[in-house]
Amino acid sequence: MSNRRETRAQAQQFIDNLKPLQHPNSEKVYLEGSRPDLKVGMRQIHQSDTLVAGDEANPVFEANPPLKVYDCAGAYSDPDANIDVRKGLEKFRENWIEERGDTVQLTSASSGFTQQRLADDGLDHLRFESLLPPRRAKEGKRVTQLHYARQGIITPEMEYIAIRENMAKSEVTDPILTQKDKGESFGAVIGEPITAEFVRQEIARGRAIIPLNINHPEAEPMIIGRNFLVKVNANIGNSAVTSSIEEEVEKLVWSTRWGADTVMDLSTGRYIHETREWIIRNSPVPIGTVPIYQALEKVNGVAEDLNWETFRDTLIEQAEQGVDYFTIHAGVLLRYVPMTAKRLTGIVSRGGSIMAKWCLSHHKENFLYEHFREICEICAAYDVSLSLGDGMRPGSIADANDEAQFSELETLGKLVKVAWEYDVQTIIEGPGHIPMNLIKENMDKQLEVCDEAPFYTLGPQTTDIAPGYDHFTSGIGAAMIAWYGCAMLCYVTPKEHLGLPNKDDVKQGLIAYKIAAHAGDVAKGHPSAQIRDNALSKARFEFRWEDQYNLGLDPETARAYHDESLPQESAKVAHFCSMCGPKFCSMKITQEVRDYAAAQEREAEARVIDIKSATEYDSYTGSESDTAKRASQREQGMAQMSAEFKAKGAELYHEASHKQPDVALED
């Protein structure tokens, strides 16, 4: 069997046998809102107890409470869920959409292309089985979360998000876990706690978006904005030369397991329409696309043959399938294209290069720019958010922050205000390849010219010397720009610039970017961010190895690394690791120092009482003989302590009476 067939067969087997999967020592829990159908899924990590006193025969333990953390996996982490990818996930938002009374269910698809695909019997074997008629806004209505927010309406989606973003912080009372630095937010103002009204205000202001198409009721509400947790997007999608529907569905599920807040389907090969349907129906997270990719497929890959009619039909096709946000390269203007001629790497954005070629071949203005108001009308009818693409982003650090990049950014700033006229939720895409010293300029300029609309960046990549490790080179920039105010980070995998990522690449990219996002949250002072850090640090100091693994982003890898050098089960309770060993473990020594210091403090208090009594008996007169007497007493005391030290073996540290005995490792 060829590698391609084997990979596809493995993906098919994954789908056929798909069951909910939980991380170690975790369970799915639900926090209830103000109505019975509003239940917010979280992952609850259980911890072991801490030994605080007693001896081996009578130990005294202190409980460590379970910790609730953000969970992107939806039903895929709920053991009670009935998973069937051929039927899709539960449409739990359907009732919320229907009860608003501002949408209508269509009798058939509006897109001509969709109608052609449905009429093609040759596609039956690829088609998703449980198709439902699409919805759109009633005539004269706008059904976007931005529209509701501006009307002062708090939707169930907004309440859901408020509960989710707080991560049950109110349940954490241990000051060891709640301690945090105030952070440096660079102007961001984060609610504490985050309320549904705060969510509504941020949406109404345009500083945040809730990307939820009315035709994607399976998606769990989430928010993208600088005053909330930094989010991470994962890219998947087939190409003309590799991957399949089965593999992309597998990557979707895999992405949500490892923390993808949104997923972009960047498919460019055959069966784009069918692949997307399978992905959306099985996705608990918002799905984004770049519609120009499919429009190009419809004109046989000839950029010059693109036209507004084909693109418009593609927007409607995807909106009625349930795509939650579109990347639109409407800022690539004809006059900006010559600015890229002196660049080292030219135009590296696929969508940007397509539109640049169209503009030059016709010597006309970008038709996406010319028809932008019509694009907004379509989005307002389905609540599709816009992600204004950075077609002029730099593809090397040599091209960073140049005239072409910032000219486009200023155009995007104007377009976001047009989108807001139509109550269309909008974010701005950013670079790219930017050295560390130029990253903050990008963030500051975006906030200024785009009126604080959420920023969504690819990295940025801080150096160009490490193909195969660009999840590192870009993770550095991602952490920095997340701190400065970026709302969502698009992950980069080890395969960036080299090939299409597989499952493991997706995981590696996501872990790198979840680290970057979390580091940004901690640095800007998000109220709930540092609790998990503190819990893991406490577990580490107390040698609770299993808790260290389970509180981390990737428990399996942490456990595997530990077991490489200390595979014995007894090592899971040992008070050292293989890095320093039992004699030089800094945390073990620190614990002994604390115990020794506490014992000395108790002894000192007792001696102070004795000295005070003696002094009162033999009152101080200030004479030279008394001074000499006190000096002699001090010397005698020091000599006594020296003798005691030697008598106890001349060891620097001694075992504390309540310390758990060392465990002898098996050979």
Swiss-Prot record:
Residues 618-642 are annotated as: Disordered. This is Phosphomethylpyrimidine synthase. [4Fe-4S] cluster binds at residues 577, 580, 585. Zn(2+) binds at residues 433, 497. The gene is thiC. Keywords: 4Fe-4S, Iron, Iron-sulfur, Lyase, Metal-binding, S-adenosyl-L-methionine, Thiamine biosynthesis, Zinc. Substrate binds at residues 235, 264, 293, 329, 349-351, 390-393, 429, 456. Catalyzes the synthesis of the hydroxymethylpyrimidine phosphate (HMP-P) moiety of thiamine from aminoimidazole ribotide (AIR) in a radical S-adenosyl-L-methionine (SAM)-dependent reaction. Belongs to the ThiC family. Homodimer. GO terms for biological process: thiamine biosynthetic process; thiamine diphosphate biosynthetic process. GO terms for cellular component: cytosol. It comes from the Bacteria. PANTHER family: PHOSPHOMETHYLPYRIMIDINE SYNTHASE, CHLOROPLASTIC, THIAMINE BIOSYNTHESIS PROTEIN THIC. Binds 1 [4Fe-4S] cluster per subunit. The cluster is coordinated with 3 cysteines and an exchangeable S-adenosyl-L-methionine. The lineage of its organism: Bacteria, Pseudomonadati, Pseudomonadota, Gammaproteobacteria, Alteromonadales. Its cofactor is [4Fe-4S] cluster. Coiled coil: none annotated. Pathway: Cofactor biosynthesis; thiamine diphosphate biosynthesis. It catalyses: 5-amino-1-(5-phospho-beta-D-ribosyl)imidazole + S-adenosyl-L-methionine = 4-amino-2-methyl-5-(phosphooxymethyl)pyrimidine + CO + 5'-deoxyadenosine + formate + L-methionine + 3 H(+). GO terms for molecular function: 4 iron, 4 sulfur cluster binding; carbon-carbon lyase activity; zinc ion binding. Its EC number is 4.1.99.17.
